[in-house]
Amino acid sequence: MRGCLQSVKWLTSALRPSQSLASSTRYPRRLLSTSAPRNAQVRKPASEVEQRIAAIPIERFRNFCIVAHVDHGKSTLSDRLLELTGTIEAGANKQVLDKLDVERERGITVKAQTCSMLYNHQGEDYLLHLVDTPGHVDFRAEVSRSYASCGGALLLVDASQGIQAQTVANFYLAFAEGLKLVPVINKVDLPSADPQRALDQMKNTFELDPESAVLVSAKTGLNVSQLLPTVIEQIPAPVGDRTKPLRMLLVDSWYSTYKGVILLVRLFDGEIRVGDQVVSFATGLKYTVGEVGIMYPWQTAQSVLRAGQVGYIYFNPAMKRSQEAKVGDTYTKVGSEKLVQPLPGFEEPKAMVFVAAYPVDASDFPHLEDSINQLILNDRSVTLQKESSEALGAGFRLGFLGTLHCSVFEDRLRQEHGASIIITPPTVPFKVIWKDGKEEIITNPALFPEEDTLRAKVTELQEPFVLATLTFPEEYLGRVIELCESNRGEQKSLEFFTSTQVILKYELPLAQLVDDFFGKLKGSTKGYASLDYEESGWRRSNISKLQLLVNKVPVDAVSRVVHSSQVQRLGRLWVSKFKEHVDRQMFEVVIQAAAGRNVVARESIKPFRKDVLQKLHAADVTRRKKLLEKQKEGRKKLKAVGNVVIEHKAFQAFLAK
């Protein structure tokens, strides 16, 4: 239905802005073309929503977001606020702002989503702009970008679980941005809820006043009506001047087949209308605005966006190249470039986990490239580099902020674009310190220095570490410490922030963290632990490249840089697993795992054997020996010149999780 409405909007555009409605009456109606000229937009009567927004001064704008640990009820609370303001109908709505299929399937927020709301407080209309942010650490770049368009935040805590690792991380992010924080305790209707404990934790951990907290149940709607007056009273209005030249920040973008790239923008000064000519500070490219509007909660066209507002725009002619939309870029009107100081933009997040992606069918490479580029438009924290493999053909090396980020991106490629892909296991970057003093960070295991180069030219190898913050009940302390120590961890601090809850800090190698550490942590604590982490620099490490050899020929698609303590275990696992997926040949196939020049594991696949003694008389011993020797020599020759053909499906099965 939404797509139909957008198509109707597109088709109903008629006159150029320079033409008047009166001038069109000179021509007979039947001679008028039904196709819209470029840069055209019909002047529709202002809707009731638009009329109400036009009457609201910037002093009655409020831009705020909801931040919390994953699964503490942010999206459900967003639904209740949208219902309370009449933005959506009550009852049948579940996670309206979780618009991706993968979000609804997994029950998590992946993309920060925005929505404008109108709310009447004490007889005056207020324009509220809500951002529902992700809770998981892998999507922190989304959270930090959201803060740029907000003046305050609702800090949400689950009454039954209390403060958890990402609550702490999100608090410090918001605090560093100078946001006004409103404490909210959610899920107070649960039998296991302990609101007083959550309030005490907020006071002790964040020094937030328990008296200012609002206790709600987003599921039942209990006390949710108290939140919006609290937002109006405590969160400051945005600062901006609509009479100044346009200064507009690009916060996010996505791709539409019919409209090209659509931009989500925050206006700091000035205003923007259909037909305005704007220019990008980052690229210098100029565009004509085709439509402006707000998310209410879906795209709702408006005649103007003013300073203080957050809304969407797209251009006519459309912005077709996704690379032109640089998140954090500043736009202004053509001619005002020297009058406007560009905004600082956003800090580029660093990719911490890398995978290689290849199409199952090599002819699908162009489709895979288009699909990845469209998803990157909507997720700028992904890095992209082309690469090729002898075994799997042309593909890409993709960088992500974490393993969940990688998994969600893979799901979106399959679901939204129908991509059939082979994904290699995640790896982390490593640093090479050369003897001439140069440092090089390498993300592709295939580029790891060879044994001779290591001895002659390399001073040391380093791997990245992270500072992990773990929160869990005190009864699991022994198991968690044991898990961290077995993953080469180094304890940094241990504190009790309640009599039963522990905050444990460990420095861990990032390589161990991406090797399903969170799954093992959940298993050790029966699901009660939470994890957050931040970069902690590089450390000298005894690492080497583990690779798979088939008849002494390296398989370039299967290689990984690992710590020496993992070489034996991984090597044995690789050869036994790969053996299952390689077909028998007319000669013996030897599968080896090697770290440098040392073979650490080996498996053999026996050849098909022809019975050369079938027609031989039983008593002819010398003839028997001669035939067997001849067969043996033939096998040696075949093994020396024969190539092992490994099918695509073998790699697919081997690399499957």
From Swiss-Prot:
UniProt topology in membrane: Peripheral membrane protein
One Pfam family of this chain: EFG_C
Keyword terms of this UniProt record: GTP-binding, Hydrolase, Membrane, Mitochondrion, Mitochondrion inner membrane, Nucleotide-binding, Protein biosynthesis, Transit peptide
GO biological process, one term: translation
Transit peptide feature range: 1-39
Subcellular localization: Mitochondrion inner membrane
A single MF term (Gene Ontology): GTPase activity
Location, primary (coarse class): mitochondrion
InterPro entries referenced in this protein's UniProt entry, alphabetically: EF-4 (IPR006297), EFG_III/V (IPR035647), EFG_V-like (IPR000640), G_TR_CS (IPR031157), LepA_C_sf (IPR038363), LepA_CTD (IPR013842), LepA_IV (IPR035654), P-loop_NTPase (IPR027417)
Domain annotation tr-type G: ranges: 59-239
Binding residue positions for GTP: 109-116, 173-177, 227-230
Gene Ontology CC annotations of this record: mitochondrial inner membrane; mitochondrial matrix
Catalytic activity: GTP + H2O = GDP + phosphate + H(+)
This enzyme's EC code(s): 3.6.5.-
PANTHER family linked: TRANSLATION FACTOR GUF1, MITOCHONDRIAL, TRANSLATION FACTOR GUF1-RELATED
Role: Promotes mitochondrial protein synthesis. May act as a fidelity factor of the translation reaction, by catalyzing a one-codon backward translocation of tRNAs on improperly translocated ribosomes. Binds to mitochondrial ribosomes in a GTP-dependent manner.
HAMAP family: LepA (MF_00071)
Family: Belongs to the TRAFAC class translation factor GTPase superfamily. Classic translation factor GTPase family. LepA subfamily.
Protein name, UniProt field: Translation factor GUF1, mitochondrial
